[in-house]
């Protein structure tokens, strides 16, 4: 359950990073 929450947060962060195009900040994900 906890891992699923992390995955969802990671997906949201990736979508936000792609949207804002923050390559340096998001390359770690």
Curated annotation (Swiss-Prot):
UniProt source species: Pseudomyrmex triplarinus (Ant)
UniProt record similarity statement: Belongs to the myrmexin family.
Lyase in keyword set: no
Main location, first listed in the record: secreted
Protein name listed in UniProt: U1-pseudomyrmecitoxin-Pt1 subunit SS3
Keywords: Disulfide bond, Secreted
Keyword Transport: no
Note: There are 6 heterodimeric myrmexins which consist of a small subunit (SS1 or SS2 or SS3) disulfide-linked to a larger, quite structurally unrelated subunit (LS1 or LS2).
Function: This heterodimer may have anti-inflammatory properties, since the myrmexin complex (composed of 6 SS-LS heterodimers) inhibits carrageenin-induced edema in a dose-dependent manner (after subcutaneous injection into rats).
Tissue/organ expression: Expressed by the venom gland.
Superkingdom per UniProt: Eukaryota
Oligomer status and interactors: Heterodimer composed of subunit SS3 and subunit LS1 (U1-PSDTX-Pt1f), and heterodimer composed of subunit SS3 and LS2 (U1-PSDTX-Pt1d); disulfide-linked.
Compartment annotation: Secreted
Recorded GO CC terms: extracellular region
């Amino acid at each position: 359950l906890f891992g699923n929450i992390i995955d969802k947060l990671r997906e949201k962060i990736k979508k936000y990073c792609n949207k804002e195009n923050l390559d340096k900040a998001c390359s770690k994900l």
